Amino acid sequence: MTAPAERTVVVTGANTGIGKATAEALARQGWRVYVASRSRDKGEAAVASIKAAASSDSVFFLALDLADLSSVRSCAEAFLARGEPLHVLVNNAGVAGVRGLTKQGFELIFGVNHLGHFVLAQLLLDRLTSSAPARVVTVASDAHYSARGIDWDALRRPARGITGLGEYAVSKLCNVLFSQELARRAAGTGVTTYALHPGVVASDIWRRVPWPVRPLMTRRMLSVDEGAATSLFCATSPEVAEASGRFYDKCAERAPSPVATPELALTLWQRSEEWSAPYMA
């Protein structure tokens, strides 16, 4: 997928890190870019920075708090009200090393990394379909390989571990499962979907991981530009146009965890629909 004419992308968490690098690269290619982030100040600063770096006037801000499904709905409504097509949604935003609950009472890492993005994608799916060919790109992680499954009860309480890395792994497994099930449901519509591992990137996602652990994690990390490479590959490469539902690492297909079964993907989808129903009507 190239951009000979202006195409439109929404990138969550594009105020910093991999998301900003992804948004800037697409803006340089002539895309119309929406920076969706929780902080208006940081988001608008990123918009200004991307505009300057890409010499583009087609970069805009959308307010989005993935920890509040009301905000997710408002974000989708704000975009849809503009009447524009949507060719790519990049589910990039994420948190790690945090404790707490979302506004709707879900474990915070799961709520931000999976459930908020699930709702956003559902609310934008009709627009993606009408703009096809279109893609949904979800930034997961190879951390999902360490998740042994989903403890459904744990999704309703704050993280119990010191680092939150167990909860992070489960949230990334959910990203992979979401992409798989969306691929099944969107088959034949012209909307394709991809999950990916960006590499271990020196980004703001690790800022809340406790000090004794953080320095060990951040050694030899990739730059944000290097980390954005696989997101850009999944968003634009013609090589993956027919490879919906696959998992990518270093711009190449990789087998996901054996825990990522179609049965678990369906169960997660159904539960996510139930949990988010009040915000989908």
List the model feature ranges, each with a label.
Residues 171, 195, 218-254, 260-266, ...:
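C-terminal helical subdomain
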Residues 8-11, 89-90, 136:
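Conserved hydrophobic beta-strands of the Rossmann-like cofactor-binding core
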Residues 94-103, 107-110, 129-189, 197-214:
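Catalytic loop of short-chain dehydrogenase/reductase
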Residues 2-37:
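Canonical Rossmann dinucleotide-binding motif of NAD(H)/NADP(H)-dependent dehydrogenases/reductases
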Residues 55-58, 78-91, 97-102:
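A glycine-rich helix->loop->beta "capping" turn
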